[in-house]
Amino acid sequence: MEKRLKKTLARTSNCGANCTKLVLLVALFTPAFWSVDRISAPIEETTHSDDGNALVTAERPRPRQLVKAYSIVKSRRPEIADMEAWRISEVILEESSRHQLDPLLILAIIQIESNFQHAAVSPVGARGLMQIMPETGRYLADALHRECGLRPADFRPESLDDPSHNIRLGTYYLHGLRKQFQDLNLALIAYNLGPGEVQSRIENNLEFSAQFADIVLDTYQNYKESLTRF
């Protein structure tokens, strides 16, 4: 989808990711259902003694929200390796919690923008899962580094193809847009058209398309409604 993304005064707040206990959940929005055992299998953790010998292996249940996210990722892209799908799901939960966003909303954006194709490149050059333009990605990476007291990032457009990096930048970007426009619908429109374009049209009382925001919000609502049935 074509974009004209521009710089925004993105700012973020820091809060730790927090997940709840395990619930069994099957995958959605695909003809084939994933087995409950497969998507909710507990994580094995091994305790070691001081000399490095294994003492005991304990099972830790996967958090409910993590299983939800994983089920969506695998339903859209069943060929993704399980380890990669879990990692993508973990990053979505971590960054959504950090920026006070619903992980299902981030999943909806990824579905509409790239259908979970981490190497997707649009005709205008937007890249990765959340389809970020390289110039916007460079600005966001530098902004994140400054907030952490680090030197400017060594950014390359190809770095947007990394799923974890792309999700971090895209979630940070949406958080900044929501703070700027004080409205989720406008934030989504700005994510698609660019904040400068949206602000200009608002100031000049000009119309702009809300099609992207409508599609994302419809997908988001479908995720919420479908997941509550399990």
Annotate the PLM regions:
Residues 1-14:
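N-terminal Lys/Arg-rich, disordered targeting/topogenic segments
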Residues 18-34:
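Hydrophobic membrane-insertion alpha-helices, especially the h-region
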Residues 31-45:
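Membrane-interface motif at the C-terminal end of an N-terminal transmembrane signal
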Residues 41-43, 47-48, 52-230:
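Catalytic glycan-binding domains that act on GlcNAc-containing polysaccharides
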